[in-house]
Amino acid sequence: MAMKTSNNRFQDRVTKELENQFMRSAVSRAQDRFQTRRLQQTQELGDWEEWRSHGEEIRKHVLENLDYYLYQLSDNVAKRGGHVFFAQTAQEATAYIQDIAKKKNAAKIVKSKSMVTEEINLNAALEELGCEVIETDLGEYILQVADHEPPSHIVAPALHKNKEQIRDVFKAKQGYTQSEKPEELALYVREKLRDEYLTADIGITGCNFAIAESGSITLVTNEGNADLVTALPKTQVTVMGMERIVPTFEEMEVLVSLLTRSAVGQKLTSYITTLTGIKDEGDTDGPEEFHLVIVDNGRSAILGGEFQPILQCIRCAACVNACPVYRHVGGHTYGSIYSGPLGVVLSPLLGGYDDFKELPYASTLCGACTDACPVKIPLHQLIHRHRQVIVENEGKAPVSEKLLMKAFGLGASSPTLYKMATKMAAPAMAPFTNDHTITKGPGPLKAWTEARDFPAPNKNSFRNWMKHRTKGDEES
């Protein structure tokens, strides 16, 4: 997987997903369930806004002092027997991990869920070496078996599939013969993966939070697969975005409380694991060799700029669960491994406007994402700023839109042209007007009216109305 997950046109992806009634109902149910649970848990926590402000302060502080905490983290990892590699690009990160796999003659690698490894397309890089890479998160495993489908949700990657579809995938690909009952499906995957953990040469994880003061990494999971990935293989590789740091355990506790409640509405996940370095003498499990790969891949270019707040993100998907656009089109429409409002903001920054210039328009700018964010990222404002950059700096607005805006500029700056245009507007739009609205407009208005009605021009202009009003006042 890489940042870009589809080469199809954005409009074609939207049309396809809008016709997928199962996906839309599945996403709606999941959003409602997550939202209800989140509200219940945040209310139990107390003053939620105070918690949000505290989380925002922590994330802002880290970003403003990121160089210091990165140095502290790397120093403490090294003191505990680990190796640290700073990867400026995705290619540098994958090359470093490929080198580890070559040195270990790795035939089998087990992975826990990690968005950053999908961002850098790590699985494909390792498979090029002939390594068998096995996803151990249940949702990611389902998608891997289903011909490497991209995830449709940051937290629940297989959200778009129901139990019958999952059963059919396992039946077609692996000869599964049991029912579609969730407990039977889960037990089947558990038995399939058990031997994989025991025979894997390398374990690879992501990182929810790295703790600078101790050189530890924290993994927040519900399935326990990440614990096995880190406990059984002799070599462990952890891949993290450079911004995923907290200063101490105290800040980690705050952010974990925000994360678990915002993601799926839990007080705590089933497993919160903190790992520090290689195993000590006498330990029965843990890696003999540990590598921490810290990935930049465009993040340093975001630091210090107007989009820096997006690096506060803790990957909870609360914004996704609140988004009305995601509710209707699902995750695959975005064409990026990052979907929802997070993907709308982050994908153009990491992947470029050439591939993701449509995403900032996949938003109503309603602000629901901003209200849901546990660390107060002003998501809808960042999305709006993307639109401004696309038009003003990147010059990527459609030709028809550029011509329309140029014509409007000429007309608005000339009193004579403006007067003529207002007189002509009503009769020109009359064939398209129905009950004072334009429901199917011509030319540049066509795209607009596909999604909403356009108000019809008034037959009586303001100037004409004012002229007659003033004349009437004078006569009276």
UniProtKB/Swiss-Prot annotation:
PROSITE patterns, A to Z: 4FE4S_FER_1
Pfam families per the UniProt record, alphabetical: Fer4_8, LUD_dom, LutB_C
Gene3D superfamilies per UniProt: Alpha-helical ferredoxin, NagB/RpiA/CoA transferase-like
A GO BP entry: lactate metabolic process
Residues bound to [4Fe-4S] cluster 1: C313, C316, C319, C373
Protein role: Is involved in L-lactate degradation and allows cells to grow with lactate as the sole carbon source. Has probably a role as an electron transporter during oxidation of L-lactate.
Domain 4Fe-4S ferredoxin-type: 304-334, 353-382
Keyword Aminoacyl-tRNA synthetase: no
Name of the protein in question: Lactate utilization protein B
